[in-house]
Regions:
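Extracytoplasmic/periplasmic membrane-proximal domains and adjacent transmembrane bundles
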Residues: 1-4, 8-37, 46-49, 114-133
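Short beta-alpha junctions and helix-cap segments that line functional grooves
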Residues: 26-30, 54-55, 71, 183
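Hydrophobic transmembrane alpha-helices and their membrane-interface caps
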Residues: 40-142, 148-166, 172, 198, ...
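Interfacial helix-loop-helix hairpins and adjacent transmembrane helices
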Residues: 112-133, 165-187, 213-239
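Structured binding elements
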Residues: 188, 192
Length: 239
């Protein structure tokens, strides 16, 4: 009996080692896919905006949205399922990028219109008050699309997250939906759905508040930097 118990323990330890090894492989692959995807998104956004600052703001919003993911997992005490949670994070990154692009692109459009009205060149900057007004107007105009994206995505994922099952064959054939909660589906798909839900709640706040603030601060810093460099350039020309 003692030998059998030892063999059972060794077999269990071996299975645990294999499980950990497989998890590490999955984690390595998904982390590589995540950062490769982010790099591709970043370069595409650079060509889209013809700027580095706006893509950098959107990338920062993606990383900050992870606060919502891990915060939600910790608060609810959910299990961190490597495969599905990482897939949820990758899906979340796409939504965050979409919302950020919608907001910043419209803000830049309003800024360009304001420049045209004031007769400013493409490389010139607006006054702080005009810049602030354009960004606030863009935030108000894009409030509804960003909120609707978040609400519809969250509502669409809730049945998957709670494991709502409906048998459509019996619903149309016998008028009995056979509705029940749980099952194998929620074990597999639940972590992915909750990951996107947790992250999207925080990401929506980031898109509407943090992203415009960062855009304003970075543009203001560029204005200050150009103002600082201009006298130096004039001094060099005089000498």
């Amino acid at each position: 009996k003692e030998e059998e118990r030892k063999k059972e323990e060794e077999r269990r330890k071996e299975e645990e080692r294999k499980g950990r090894k497989e998890q590490n492989k999955q984690m390595t692959f998904l982390m590589g896919a995540f950062f490769t995807g982010l790099a591709l998104i970043f370069f595409i956004l650079i060509f889209q905006f013809n700027s580095v600052s706006k893509p950098a703001i959107i990338m920062l919003a993606i990383f900050l949205s992870l606060i919502g993911v891990f915060g939600g997992i910790v608060i609810t005490g959910s299990a961190f399922v490597i495969m599905m949670t990482m897939m949820g994070i990758i899906a979340l990154a796409g939504i965050v990028v979409n919302n950020g692009v919608v907001l910043l692109d419209y803000a830049q459009l309003l800024i360009d219109r304001k420049k045209h009205e004031k007769g400013l060149g493409k490389n010139q900057y607006l006054e702080k008050s005009d810049l602030f007004e354009s960004i606030v107007t863009a935030g108000k105009a894009r409030l509804r699309p960003v909120l609707l994206t978040a609400i519809t995505t969250i509502l669409g994922l809730i049945p998957l997250a709670i494991g709502l099952n409906i048998n459509f064959f019996t619903l149309f054939g016998e008028f009995d939906a056979n509705i029940y909660f749980g099952g194998d589906n929620v074990i597999f798909w639940g972590p992915l759905a909750w990951t996107v839900i947790y992250g999207l709640i925080v990401a929506t706040f980031l898109t509407l508040i943090i992203v415009p603030i960062l855009f304003f601060l970075i543009t203001t810093f560029k204005m200050w930097l150009r103002h600082k460099m201009k006298p130096n350039m004039q001094t060099e020309l005089i000498h």
